[in-house]
Amino acid sequence: MTVALMWEARAVDGRGEQLLAWAREQDLAQEPLRRETFRAPGDRVLVITWWDTAYDAELPELPEPDGELVRRSVHRWRFESVTAG
């Protein structure tokens, strides 16, 4: 099964590039199948990692950035792939 972990944070105004750089620098304890980093208006950064594992498996996640860098807590979601029926 493929599991996708999504990590999304919103930077303090004007610090989106710093948050993006911070997210890119973070190493995970295990290497995912795939990792992509995105940015969006409003100084938001999204990181998605894909894993070949069970939905409830323990997986490494990006930590919370320094409170001076973000305006709110990180949002995290876990999804599993489904096949078209």
Where do the protein language model's features map onto the residues?
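Glycine-rich beta-strand-turn "strand-cap" elements at beta-sheet edges
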Residues: 1, 33-46, 62-85
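Short glycine-/aliphatic-rich beta-strand segments at the starts of folded cytosolic domains
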Residues: 2-11
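Hydrophobic pocket/interface hotspot
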Residues: 7, 19, 23, 35, ...
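Short amphipathic alpha-helical segments
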Residues: 11-34, 62-65
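Helix N-cap motif at beta-to-alpha junctions
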Residues: 12-15, 50-56
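A beta-strand edge to alpha-helix "cap/lid" segment located at domain peripheries
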Residues: 21-25, 52-64, 79-84
